Curated annotation (Swiss-Prot):
Pathway: Sphingolipid metabolism; galactosylceramide biosynthesis; Lipid metabolism; fatty acid metabolism. It holds the Pfam family FA_hydroxylase. Zn(2+) 1 binds at H234, H239, H257, H261, H339. It catalyses: a 1,2-saturated fatty acid + 2 Fe(II)-[cytochrome b5] + O2 + 2 H(+) = a (R)-2-hydroxy fatty acid + 2 Fe(III)-[cytochrome b5] + H2O; hexadecanoate + 2 Fe(II)-[cytochrome b5] + O2 + 2 H(+) = (R)-2-hydroxyhexadecanoate + 2 Fe(III)-[cytochrome b5] + H2O; octadecanoate + 2 Fe(II)-[cytochrome b5] + O2 + 2 H(+) = (R)-2-hydroxyoctadecanoate + 2 Fe(III)-[cytochrome b5] + H2O; docosanoate + 2 Fe(II)-[cytochrome b5] + O2 + 2 H(+) = 2-hydroxydocosanoate + 2 Fe(III)-[cytochrome b5] + H2O. Binds 2 Zn(2+) ions per subunit that likely form a catalytic dimetal center. Keywords: Endoplasmic reticulum, Fatty acid biosynthesis, Fatty acid metabolism, Heme, Iron, Lipid biosynthesis, Lipid metabolism, Membrane, Metal-binding, Microsome, Oxidoreductase, Sphingolipid metabolism, Transmembrane, Transmembrane helix, Zinc. This is Fatty acid 2-hydroxylase.
Length: 372
């Protein structure tokens, strides 16, 4: 017979208040207590919205307005469970509130799904690297990978390979912005010093001179081109569903994007590591050089590379930043978090919703009335 699980910790209202006074952000759902201190800065609605509810019952907030929290959001909450609220025999004035909390009921149909997360009973062993394990999940992989967890991930046994699979956010501008500046300067000089003609390889008679002013247009075109690449890769490659009988395609999907959906707040896996990024960037450079005149392709590539840098920085900020309510980034953060927690088959734009509008993959608006 398996040993009985240890009893849940319990806290009196006075103990909860002491933690709140020390700066912690505890909330409750009925009599269940959750320590959201480490999650406050990640909350898609902003820090202040969560801090304003410290010490309060959030049961009604989970159902909205402004929106009803998804099943994944409720599972996520359970990872922060710390115990139960209990009466204090030394302070009978608080016991009425405790009794009220204990009698509050949650949806009985949902309650069994959202018990305290038991890492020992998950489909994988979290004490070991995950990559080889996920390939064995088969038909269970797709559901498992879209149930996010609040913990870091290890992919490989080898420390060296593991190091190449992660990076810090600031490696992206440090490595790629100098290359953007160099390419931009180099190709701009080519425009000013050489007689660059468009379509010269096809016909000399109808070829056109390229003035210096075309640089800005081509550079911006490259940035726009990146937003399209971002959308296409995210939708059709990262969100492909690997065959359940293919061990290696499941592993490939997990390396490319599944790991990010499983652990969306693992900061070391939010931006593209330099080594694999170099291979992808080199591919696009060669591709543009092959299909376009060298200078044209080079300028578009430089703009696209800057677009990639802005995309990766935006992506990191959407996960870890706290944009002002009503701002562009605030709306993009809410949009992206919904993609992670509820709408994995829509909302593929990260730096812009442009292509979601164009291809009709916008996340639907909720019908809840606006908060006053």
């Amino acid at each position: 017979m398996a040993p009985a699980p240890p009893p849940a910790a319990s806290f009196t209202p006075a103990e909860v208040q002491r933690r709140l006074a020390a700066g912690a952000c505890w909330v409750r759902r009925g009599a269940s207590l959750y320590d959201l201190t480490s999650f406050v800065r990640h909350h898609p609605g902003g820090e202040q919205l969560l801090l304003a509810r410290a010490g309060q019952d959030i049961s009604a907030d989970l159902d909205g307005p402004p929106h009803r929290h998804s099943d994944n959001a409720r599972r996520w909450l359970e990872q922060y469970y710390v115990g139960e609220l209990r009466a204090d025999p030394q302070d009978p004035t608080e016991n009425g509130a405790v009794a009220s909390a204990e009698t509050q009921k949650t949806d009985p149909a949902l309650e069994p799904q959202f018990k305290v997360v038991d890492w020992d009973k998950d489909l994988v062993d979290w004490q070991k690297p995950l990559l080889w394990q996920v390939g064995h999940l088969g038909e269970k992989y797709d559901e498992w990978v879209h149930q996010p967890v609040a913990r870091p991930i290890r992919l490989f046994h080898s420390d060296l390979i593991e190091a190449f699979s992660k990076t810090v956010w600031y490696s992206v501008p440090i490595i790629w912005v100098p290359l953007v500046l160099y390419l931009s300067w180099s190709y701009y000089r080519t425009l000013t010093q050489d007689n660059i003609r468009l379509f010269a390889s096809l016909t000399r008679e109808y070829s056109m001179m390229m003035p210096e002013s075309v640089f800005i247009g081509l550079f911006v075109l490259g940035m726009l081109f990146w937003t399209f690449v971002e959308y296409v890769i995210h939708r059709f490659l990262f969100h492909m569903k690997p065959p359940s009988n293919s061990h290696y395609l499941i592993m490939l999907h997990f390396v490319m994007h599944g790991q990010h959906h499983k652990a969306p707040f693992d900061g070391s896996r939010l931006v593209f590591p330099p080594v694999p990024a170099s291979l992808v960037i080199a591919f696009f450079y060669v591709f543009l050089r092959l299909i376009l005149p060298e200078t044209v392709g080079g300028i578009i590539f430089a703009g696209g590379l800057l677009g990639y840098v802005l995309y990766d920085m935006t992506h990191y900020y959407l996960h870890f930043g706290s944009p002002h309510k009503g701002s562009y980034l605030y709306n993009m953060k809410a949009h992206h978090v919904k993609h992670h927690f509820e709408y994995q088959k829509s909302g593929f734009g990260i730096s812009t919703k442009l292509w979601d509008y164009f291809f009709h993959t916008l996340i639907p608006e909720e019908a809840h009335p606006k908060m006053q």
